[in-house]
């Protein structure tokens, strides 16, 4: 794929999106990371499905446990999509070609968001189908024909996309790969393990929302957020961080501000 000649500084959204797509698909780390997410979610889904022994438990929720690994991979990808340009210095060329800095972030968000949503849903559905096939005899076999199961699987894929966008936003805010990755790991993974899970704020932590709401087909005791409300909260996190990233990208120097 080639990008048609566009005068320097006059990229429109369509041209900028094509350029971003080329950059994204030529990042070797993207392909490997997506393969890791797919393989990991399938493997965990199979193990969780086969090892489920409680016939009254939420089998679907168990099978979707691989979403924790998947969300880490997608968070890393989001960080890399943004910080790779800062580490290589190509962000200056990008901003020279697209002086409207909000457009730069909008394009990255749109292109990566579409890729993350499609691949996140694919990995989640693959993990679920593989895990469901290995559920033992005597344990209820979940099926996509069940509305609550289809909702849980679909929202789990959307969760991966949103965590990836959170990673992208933090990458734009921090501009350093290791620091941005540390920030997203703390927000998504460390906070639930740091005692916050038992506090009133616990139900607003991304990973707990995923485990107890988005990926659940049965109400979880003590967790009052509905699946759609949980997804809305995660989307708000991503939106607020992306807004902050857009403001910072527009107000400071490309590399040193």
Give residue ranges: language-model regions.
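Aromatic- and glycine-rich beta-strand/loop motifs that create alpha-glucan
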Residues: 1-34, 175
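Terminal transmembrane helical anchor/hairpin motif
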Residues: 2-11, 33-37, 42-61, 144, ...
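Residue-level signature of transmembrane alpha-helical entry/exit and packing/kink sites
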Residues: 15, 29, 33, 65-68, ...
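Transmembrane helix boundary and interhelical loop/hinge segments in multi-pass membrane proteins
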Residues: 56-59, 78-97, 101-102, 109
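Long, hydrophobic alpha-helical segments
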Residues: 64-85
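Hydrophobic alpha-helical transmembrane segments of polytopic membrane proteins
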Residues: 73-79, 149-174, 232-245
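Selective transmembrane-helix segments that form parts of the transport pathway or gating/packing helices
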Residues: 102-130
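Membrane-interfacial helix-loop-helix connectors in multipass membrane proteins
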Residues: 129-153
């Amino acid at each position: 794929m080639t990008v048609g000649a566009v005068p320097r500084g006059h990229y429109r959204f369509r041209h900028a999106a094509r350029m971003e797509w080329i950059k994204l698909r030529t990042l070797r780390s993207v392909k490997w990371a997506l393969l890791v997410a797919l393989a990991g979610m399938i493997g965990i889904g199979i193990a969780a499905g086969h090892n489920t022994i409680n016939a009254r438990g939420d089998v679907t929720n168990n099978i979707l446990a691989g979403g924790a690994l998947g969300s880490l991979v997608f968070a890393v990808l989001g960080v890399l999509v943004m910080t790779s340009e800062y580490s290589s210095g190509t962000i200056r060329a990008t901003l020279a070609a697209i002086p409207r800095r909000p457009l730069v972030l909008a394009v990255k968000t749109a292109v990566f968001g579409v890729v993350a949503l499609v691949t996140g849903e694919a990995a989640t559905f693959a993990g679920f189908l593989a895990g469901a096939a290995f559920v033992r005899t005597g344990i209820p076999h979940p099926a996509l024909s069940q509305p609550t199961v289809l909702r849980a699987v679909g929202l789990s894929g959307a969760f991966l996309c949103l965590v990836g966008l959170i990673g992208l936003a933090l990458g734009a805010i921090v501009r350093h790969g290791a620091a941005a990755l540390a920030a997203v790991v703390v927000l998504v993974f460390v906070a639930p393990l740091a005692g916050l899970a038992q506090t009133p704020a616990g139900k607003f932590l991304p990973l707990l929302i995923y485990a107890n709401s988005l990926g659940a087909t049965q109400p979880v005791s003590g967790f009052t957020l509905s699946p759609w409300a949980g997804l809305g909260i995660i989307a708000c996190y991503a939106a607020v961080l992306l807004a902050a990233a857009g403001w910072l990208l527009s107000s400071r120097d490309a590399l040193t501000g």
